[in-house]
């Protein structure tokens, strides 16, 4: 894991004459998150849930394929994902040269607006066009240095303009699984420097920003485990930065006997450690962008049981907002691992049925997503983004818990809650002479943030204690606040340098 400087907010108190000098780092307070992330008060009563999402292989009538799948499993997806390379449609004109809208048009022609999913584009820097100099270096991907040096800027800009012109909400999953040697854009093929990947990501993102694209959200998606597991290849080394990432995605499968060694890996074996690690590292909503399991021996190891277990455990991870099943063969190859839960359609339109013994797969999936926690709407990014990082432990935090105030003055306290499961209400309990204004007094799972503005008005000097009471079904917590009212408060800023 890359070294991340977590700078505590340093207060040093010294009594000089009749006042109190306070020494503070310039970074400011960030609730339970020490990196200065903005805390947003909770909005209207709304339980986020987890968005039901699916990868379906593109077909001639993709909209009908989505509709058929929805009917089979009893719930429409909030997100649909498919793969695309960097070739576009060289025979088209205008923006269609950079982005072929055929699949999206079949969706809009088949599904009513209310039933159309958000679209995750897994955007792979493959193929390109020799004539433009932005081309694949076979058998690898388009070389990352070529992208960074601007050889693909014309295509990237045209692609960005094409997406901007569409009405859909896009999740752009660019150059995914960059931390495994199977990936054509893994930097280990040309060296061992993940900063190259980071620079390429930021370069591509910068072009989208210049174009002014507002309907694209960026999904950074490593594999759940780095391969090789060398320190330089740690997935955190590939993180491009909070300012250019909207969602964190993950990929991980139970391959069992289709890959060596033949280990039956449950959901927690794949995802538990990495979901918690990422929640502790980045205040970003999480997506399981590729998940699937093959069949086991049918007795000790069962695919149907695996599905039920995975979907029952996913809601316990507070940052996880989307679970997206990979409803296809691995690599779209019928000779490879079969992760499907329903029949699928080949590109020629032929139906690829499930094996005769697999009737339980669809039933298990239908039952699993039938849980009301799995929704048919992807929450807005602002609602899906957690208020702070969370490293486990106490889900409730109040900061700063100690205030220095003059007799007439004010300060703002941030209150965060992460990982709770029942609706909560907040109430400030402050002593006489000190008032408080609470923004966001109703919290809904899985997280929320509020701010409490504390004011003194001709308050006598002295030491005061108060609290914020958090209550809900089966839960009652009190977060203490200490307030020292002094004649004067002198702020002295100490610049802190990250190393």
Q: What does each model-found stretch correspond to?
A:
Residues 86-220:
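Substrate-binding cleft of extracellular glycoside hydrolase catalytic domains
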Residues 205-233, 283-296, 322-328:
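Aromatic-lined carbohydrate-recognition surfaces of secreted/lumenal glycan-active proteins
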């Amino acid at each position: 894991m890359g070294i991340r400087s977590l700078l505590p907010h340093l207060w040093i108190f010294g009594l000089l004459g009749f006042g109190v000098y306070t020494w503070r780092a310039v970074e400011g307070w960030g609730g339970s998150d020490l990196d200065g992330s903005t805390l947003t008060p909770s909005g209207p009563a709304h339980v986020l849930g987890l968005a039901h999402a699916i990868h379906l292989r593109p077909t001639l009538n993709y909209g009908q394929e989505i509709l058929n799948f929805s009917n089979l499993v009893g719930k429409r997806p909030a997100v649909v994902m498919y793969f695309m390379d960097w070739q576009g449609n060289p025979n088209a004109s205008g923006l269609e040269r950079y982005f072929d809208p055929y699949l999206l048009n079949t969706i809009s022609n088949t599904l009513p607006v209310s039933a159309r999913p958000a679209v995750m584009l897994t955007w792979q820097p493959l193929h390109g066009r020799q004539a433009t100099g932005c081309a694949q270096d076979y058998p690898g991907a388009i070389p990352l240095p070529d992208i960074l040096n601007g050889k693909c800027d014309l295509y990237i800009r045209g692609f960005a303009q094409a997406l901007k012109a569409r009405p859909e909400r896009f999740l752009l999953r660019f150059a995914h699984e960059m931390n495994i040697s199977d990936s054509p854009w893994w930097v280990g093929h040309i060296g061992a420097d993940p900063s190259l990947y980071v620079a390429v990501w930021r370069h591509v993102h910068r072009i989208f920003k210049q174009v002014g694209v507002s309907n694209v959200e960026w999904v950074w998606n490593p594999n759940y485990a780095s391969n090789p597991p060398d320190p330089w290849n740690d997935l955190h080394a590939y993180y491009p930065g909070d300012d250019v990432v909207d969602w964190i995605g993950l990929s991980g499968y139970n391959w069992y006997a289709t890959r060596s060694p033949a280990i039956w890996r449950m959901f927690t074996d794949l995802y538990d450690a990495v979901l918690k690690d990422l929640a502790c590292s980045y205040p970003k909503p999480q997506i399981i962008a590729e998940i699937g399991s093959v069949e086991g021996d049918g007795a000790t190891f069962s695919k149907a049981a695996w599905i039920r277990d995975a979907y029952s455990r996913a809601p316990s991870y507070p940052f996880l907002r989307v679970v997206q099943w990979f409803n296809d063969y691995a690599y779209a190859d019928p000779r490879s691992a079969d992760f499907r839960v329903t029949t699928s359609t080949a590109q020629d339109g032929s139906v690829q049925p499930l094996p005769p013994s697999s009737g339980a797969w669809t039933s298990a999936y239908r039952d699993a997503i039938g849980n009301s926690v799995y929704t048919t709407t992807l929450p807005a990014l602002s609602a899906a983004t957690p208020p702070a990082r969370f490293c486990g432990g106490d889900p409730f935090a109040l900061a700063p818990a100690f205030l220095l105030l003059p007799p007439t003055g004010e300060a703002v306290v941030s209150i965060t809650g992460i990982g709770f499961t029942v609706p909560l209400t907040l109430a400030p309990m402050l002593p006489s002479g000190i008032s408080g204004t609470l923004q966001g007094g109703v919290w809904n799972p899985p997280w929320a943030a509020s701010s409490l503005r504390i004011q003194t008005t001709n308050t006598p000097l002295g030491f005061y204690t108060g609290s914020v009471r958090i209550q809900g079904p089966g839960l009652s917590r009190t977060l203490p606040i200490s307030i020292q009212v002094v004649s004067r408060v002198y702020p002295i800023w100490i610049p802190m340098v990250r190393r």
